[in-house]
């Protein structure tokens, strides 16, 4: 990124509508690399730092010269991008051609370019001289859409802007797709990878490191937020390597089922039954794996104190919680916590069902649903929960709007948000004070993305208050090992450990290699000093003016500080004076610390900020039937 641009914004105010300094500095780099030199870029910015806005601002700037195709994982994220594109158009202070920007979900883009599962090569010519932006780039490859991207790259020779906060999803092999899309060289990945017997033993060899450095040189933009911009994190539980883990010791009832299931499982790391029983037990496997039959049972006994009737769980076990050591710890703990909770769980066979009835029976009410037994309250409101799974994608945005609303800062509307892997995508959660992992994530990428949904810039009004993180592991009743090193156990020893502990160790092994490669990528990130790129000059000046008039309500039209600031970009007295006259005559929009939303006006020999409000009559619509006639109804 352009460090000279960063240094223009010392003491930057970021609590007003604005483009952040690091975003401007990155835009400069993207223009020089992608637009000027037709090179691809990996935008490796840690989650929560504003990759989406950077990509959309870049798309707007280059839309004057090229068509831009933006691919996102699904329709929900497409809606997020469309909404943010409107924000970007309000922020950017330059011309653009909005018709040249096309946003597609990967499924829609695939269907546009395939006929009967065969690529329509004749139609690909329309992508000549364009730029592709790929969101969640680490997830788009390894399928038909990824194959199509490779074809377009080879046929059309177009550059790609790849967005990723975690370019390695599981092992270094997943990075190979990103390398191939950014390179014209043929790469034999068997030459650069050391394959172990286990997934976590796959590592990049010395040749692989060399290939990485050569191919991605000058093609990486890395950025992470400063600690002062985020709340501190307090991990709870027992020391476990470089973190803490809560050991949730099983009751005899859960341990019996757990051991039986483990004996029956082959390749248990990928066995949904192990994930299920580490969360909660719901009777014999033949029942738990046949929920469609179980849901029609009448008063079916699962355990002496737990029954199911027409899909409804009831019985003392839902409050005693011998069926789940994790939920016993969770329910015992949340009564003493304040603020909103985000709870990640793997949506395996019966996770959502158990969660719902445990919460209801312990006094927590379902948002827009059933009221809990002896309902618990907060400030006169029910303490409520919501469960998010992939099946409810259509209503997720409405739910998150309520969860993130200022009126829910302390959980007055929704206190507990349970979510499966869908929340590892491009969503933002605000004011979350307690984060729970009911299921151990499979990868470092997944773990980071779940944390990154909440712990991000602008998600907290007060960053001085910490965020609590609870990583829960189901363990045997007599298990109390202190694990300080990955060398504490052999591979054979690891296989005898509780499933969650084994999964944690596998996660940490993969994390070690992932961090090594991320360090290499970070070192490849390019920083330089230069005057702003010509296509970004107006944008940089616009942000400087916004910052200046945040502090100043009235200045002389010949104000020395204003002149010096603008002239630092133009280095021309005549151009500087013309620019100051232009922003005044055009009534440039600013946010002032006293008058808030304002427009610039000239009053005699001064520039003043004039506050404004947009007024409208409720239920009044203006319909443009034709250019000459407007009708108000």
From Swiss-Prot:
PROSITE patterns associated with the record: DEAH_ATP_HELICASE, HELICASE_ATP_BIND_1, HELICASE_CTER
Family stated for the protein in its record: Belongs to the helicase family. VETF subfamily.
SUPFAM superfamilies: P-loop containing nucleoside triphosphate hydrolases (SSF52540)
Protein name as catalogued: Early transcription factor 70 kDa subunit
Species for this entry: Fowlpox virus (strain NVSL)
EC number(s) recorded for this UniProt protein: 3.6.4.-
Gene: VETFS
Domain of life where this protein originates: Viruses
Function according to Swiss-Prot or TrEMBL: Acts with RNA polymerase to initiate transcription from early gene promoters. Is recruited by the RPO-associated protein of 94 kDa (RAP94) to form the early transcription complex, which also contains the core RNA polymerase. ETF heterodimer binds to early gene promoters.
